[in-house]
Regions:
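Membrane-interface loop-to-helix entry segments
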Residues: 92-106
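Membrane-anchoring alpha-helices and their flanking helix-loop junctions
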Residues: 1-90, 105-157
Length: 157
């Protein structure tokens, strides 16, 4: 199944894929966690030096996420590859198949850490599972249908 609303008649993949929906899901989960931290989940709030540690790690993750996003979107010119139905396997895409999703997930982890609530750490594996299941059942299937063995070989690296 393809998202036809985002394609022209010659393009086989949507430009943005399921990405915007997944990013909204991560943001909604983190906002819900923030709201619950103000009430039901107050028992998980950190005090003292751990808050500073969470802030530092969160900031570093958000910085790294921004860099990965820039490399995977701006520097790689992924939009052109998608429009031309080319499989992108160079640059950051030589290291990971889904750097854009990975960057958003890292940014989400960074924001969770900035909330200073240990209960919210449970969101990290939940978000990873959601991203993994959705990507495998949408974009990875679409890419295999479009590129066949070339995509299978790319995944095997």
């Amino acid at each position: 199944m393809y998202l036809k609303s985002d394609q022209d008649k010659h393009q086989k993949l949507p430009t943005y894929g399921v990405g915007p929906y997944l990013v909204v899901c991560i943001i909604a989960m983190n906002l819900t966690g923030w709201m619950l931290s103000q009430s039901e989940l107050q028992s998980g709030l950190l005090k003292g030096g751990f808050k500073d540690l969470f802030d530092l790690i969160g900031f570093i993750l958000m910085f790294v996420a921004t860099r990965i996003w820039w490399l995977s979107v701006v520097k790689s010119d992924i939009d052109t590859s998608i429009q031309n139905n080319e499989l992108k396997t160079t640059g950051i895409y030589a290291r990971t198949r889904n750097p854009i999703y990975f960057s958003w997930w890292l940014c989400g982890i960074g924001s969770i850490l900035h909330l200073h609530n240990v209960w919210l750490l449970l969101l990290i594996p939940i978000q990873w599972v959601i991203l993994t299941v959705v990507i495998r059942n949408t974009e990875e299937k679409w890419l295999y249908e479009l590129h066949g063995e070339a995509y299978k070989d790319y995944c095997a690296r």
